[in-house]
């Protein structure tokens, strides 16, 4: 069922970006609640009645009402919003206006400025046939469509001819391609242009030599007394023929398709230009006798005449001549019609003039075939005057023949001229189209233009949809896939990747822009399978012991050695942000700012998250002036046994400006007493000395650090009654133990708190954290080493800001005052024993962070929660836990009764 949009976000957003797929009953209810439906096409909203869409039930909009499941709806529309009863189609909004009017009026018209092909595609998408177009628009639509289809067909043929030049399947493809471009594409290079000019010069020279050979002054008589070619001109012709032969052979050898080369009209002309020369040489050299030569001479003359075809070789280098040839080939219908008209006129008028002039003396119209010449010359309006009619009837027939000739020739000639003009323009357009296509291909190869066809768009949309449904048999991985069952593409900006310990901090800004997820009861009720409350304490202890044992063995002195790189089979990187409170700023200790951020190991529990904090590059909120963060942890207490070593929490050093000078106080806390209660029997096993429990069911109680600190760990293992984790609303910082050489058990703090601890677990009044800045107790001061400081900005942190940098850039600030303990059901780890007075200062609850290893890639739920919403949750009133890291409060002034400023960073 669709979830409610969290506060601070746009509630009018579409369904698919914020919620799970709705149930069919919700879809049916949304359609039946209103007689109208909103259709959003390309951002333009339309409102129409359902019954209007029912007029064409077989169309896309007609099928919309019958789609009652999420999958069927997405097959019809691109997105939908049931709350607004709105369906979105990412199509052309202008064309949809005509289509929607067709539903309303039953008449389909095409807009004047609309492209015919584009409108046809829109009709196909909406499921409307083009035959419904009105007569006023149908002729224009089909004319434009046929014209565009013809142009596209010609362009496709040209591109197909270009793509057919494949040299991969032949030997020396690169060299052959260069040679082919050199001979066939004069514009490909300067050398190709020079070669084309040389070829043109040889054609002109051969034509001139052929013409000069016919001059009697330059001819020579052979041994038989017959005129023959001049020897010098014969040598010139031989050189030209040699050039033509070499050019033809090189074209043939470099051509990608030999059969296509032979069929080419230009190549046929080249062959006819050189073939007569070799045939003439063969015939003259093989027949030396006079009789044989006389018989062969006529054949040789025919081939000598064919030499004139060399002039047609210029068509290879002239676009105009090529256009003329293609025009004649494409205008064969008009040319045939012209010849038919002329033949009919010639036959009619030659017969008439013959019968009109046959009785005259010395007439030249002796027969009808003899009159064909006169009729042809007359109809073409040439009029040589060698033959003409003399009688009156003959002259009348001649006049009618002239008029008929003008009409017959004038009709088909303009069609041929138009074809030539159109073909010439098309040639220019195709040249530009080829250049544009080549530029687009280069841009696609370079990655500057992405193909946006339907298949690519569908593939990208399918990549975004990743619904993980775990089977019953895959119980081992069910904890990692519970929160994957959603279709929100905006949630998949967070990808799980394993990075080295030396990875750059800048990668966080691009790789992990996690979008905040919504608050839903389903997510809160999934704690039985995905919540870290069901982690076994024994497993966490064993895991942490392995980590700490590896670190202590490899680094006896962690302060002096670097932690070696150890491969992590499973790492997660989580971006954490500092929560900046818009309240008063306090002076801070002058400490060094840590600017290095590392990755977070998923196998580390929150107890081993020793971290540097820096938000100067990552947080969208400007940090307060001179606000620095530094973490330092207490070292081992000398003289303590293994069971007395625990991880003390990092403490705050505050400096608050009360007057002219800032006052700073640093406290050293030394835990000296530990009481461990195991309520779960022997199932958890004994608590290891140097292990920290990651179980959210444990609770460590802090006492007054100035006197003694009593810590209690309670393990209550009950899977059926696991407490649900209320939403925490601060973004975690990227931390990992793999990146810090100081992540030993002495440098880590785990405090797991319960709101209502079991009876008997309350601490003494002295166990509360003191607000007075005193030195350590006298009994402990000689044995407690100097603690490392963890100074924060000294300001009150009674509010937190949830930052969502992934999608909405909305900032939600929740101010929550902390009421008295008796009325506050919020988690608190410090409790007084029954009947004893409480410390007048407020205690700051600290809670455990869920272990990253138990969560999947989108497990971090940034849940928006209004003020007091936790109190209203009846299912969690009795037993609530909150997972976050915190720094306990330390009041710098004994007289201050205000709340201790804390800095919370929740995971």
UniProtKB/Swiss-Prot annotation:
Compartments in which it is found: Cell membrane; Perikaryon; Cell projection, Dendrite
Keywords noted in UniProt: Cell membrane, Cell projection, Glycoprotein, Ion channel, Ion transport, Membrane, Phosphoprotein, Potassium, Potassium channel, Potassium transport, Transmembrane, Transmembrane helix, Transport, Voltage-gated channel
Regions that span the bilayer: 191-212, 233-254, 266-284, 297-317, 333-355, 396-424
Family annotation (SMART domains): BTB
Positions where Phosphoserine occurs in the chain: 448, 608
Motif (Selectivity filter): 381-386
Cytoplasmic-facing ranges: 1-190, 255-265, 318-332, 425-907
Intramembrane stretches listed in the entry: 369-380, 381-388
Inhibition and activation profile: Inhibited by quinine at micromolar levels. Modestly sensitive to millimolar levels of tetraethylammonium (TEA). Modestly sensitive to millimolar levels of 4-aminopyridine (4-AP).
Glycosylation (residues): 287
Record bears the keyword Transport: yes
Any one Gene Ontology molecular-function term assigned to this protein's record: potassium channel regulator activity
Superkingdom assignment: Eukaryota
Membrane topology, from the record: Multi-pass membrane protein
Record note on quaternary structure: Homotetramer or heterotetramer with KCNB1. Heterotetramer with KCNS1 and KCNS2. Interacts (via phosphorylated FFAT motif) with VAPA and VAPB.
Function statement: Voltage-gated potassium channel that mediates transmembrane potassium transport in excitable membranes, primarily in the brain and smooth muscle cells. Channels open or close in response to the voltage difference across the membrane, letting potassium ions pass in accordance with their electrochemical gradient. Homotetrameric channels mediate a delayed-rectifier voltage-dependent outward potassium current that display rapid activation and slow inactivation in response to membrane depolarization.
Family statement: Belongs to the potassium channel family. B (Shab) (TC 1.A.1.2) subfamily. Kv2.2/KCNB2 sub-subfamily.
Protein name: Potassium voltage-gated channel subfamily B member 2
